[in-house]
Curated annotation (Swiss-Prot):
The family this protein is said to belong to: Belongs to the universal ribosomal protein uS4 family.
Gene Ontology BP, a term: ribosomal small subunit biogenesis
Species for this entry: Pseudomonas entomophila (strain L48)
Function in brief: One of the primary rRNA binding proteins, it binds directly to 16S rRNA where it nucleates assembly of the body of the 30S subunit. With S5 and S12 plays an important role in translational accuracy.
Gene name of the record: rpsD
Highest taxon in the source lineage: Bacteria
One GO term describing the cellular component: small ribosomal subunit
Keywords, alphabetical: Ribonucleoprotein, Ribosomal protein, RNA-binding, rRNA-binding
Name of the protein this chain belongs to: Small ribosomal subunit protein uS4
Molecular function per GO: rRNA binding; structural constituent of ribosome
Domain S4 RNA-binding: 96-156
Lineage: Bacteria, Pseudomonadati, Pseudomonadota, Gammaproteobacteria, Pseudomonadales
Subunit structure: Part of the 30S ribosomal subunit. Contacts protein S5. The interaction surface between S4 and S5 is involved in control of translational fidelity.
Amino acid sequence: MARYIGPKCKLSRREGTDLFLKSGVRALESKCNIEAAPGIHGQRRGRQSDYGTQLREKQKVRRIYGVLERQFRGYYQAAASKKGATGENLLQMLECRLDNVVYRMGFGSTRSESRQLVSHKAISVNGKTVNIPSYQVRPGDVVSVREKSLNQLRIVQALELCAQRGRVEWVDVDAAKKSGVFKNVPARSDLSADINENLIVELYSK
C-alpha cells in the first residue's frame, strides 16, 4: 500500500487542526490556513453527519501517527482484545511505536523523519539495530542513535527543536549521548486532549 507523500499542510487543513506533520521551525498556522479545507471550495465546511465526524477523527489520528488504514484497523482490533478502555489502549499502542518514541525523544523533528531514521537503520533499541517503525517499545527500553548517525545534522537540529518545545515526561533523554529511556507507557491524561478516541471506537463498533 502506498504512503501519502503529498503536501503535509493539505492533510492538516483537511482535518482542520495542526497534525504536527511538519517540523517546528515555524508554527503551521503561519504557513497555511488550517481553518479552511483544501480545494477550490475550501472556505466552506459543511455540516457533518455522526459518521462523518467519526471518520474524520479516525483519519486525524491515523495521519498524526502516520499509519495506513489496514495497519490502523489492526491496532484497533488488538486494542479491543486487551483489558481496559479500547480507545485508550489504541492510543497507547500508537505511542509505543518506535518511530513515535524516536520523535518523542527528539531525535527526529517529525514522526515522518523519525520513521525514516528507523528505516535507515540509524536507531538501536537496547544496543540492537531495529529498522521496523512499528516495533513496540517497552518500559525500560533504551533507544539510541547509532554511532554512524550521531553527527547527522537533522538529528542535531531536531534535538535543538525538542529542547525548545519541551519533552514528554515518559521519556528520559541524554541529549549529549543521543540516547534515552522509555520510562513508561503514558496514561490517557498525558496525551492530547484534542483527540476523541471514543469516536473511533464508535466508528469501528458499527
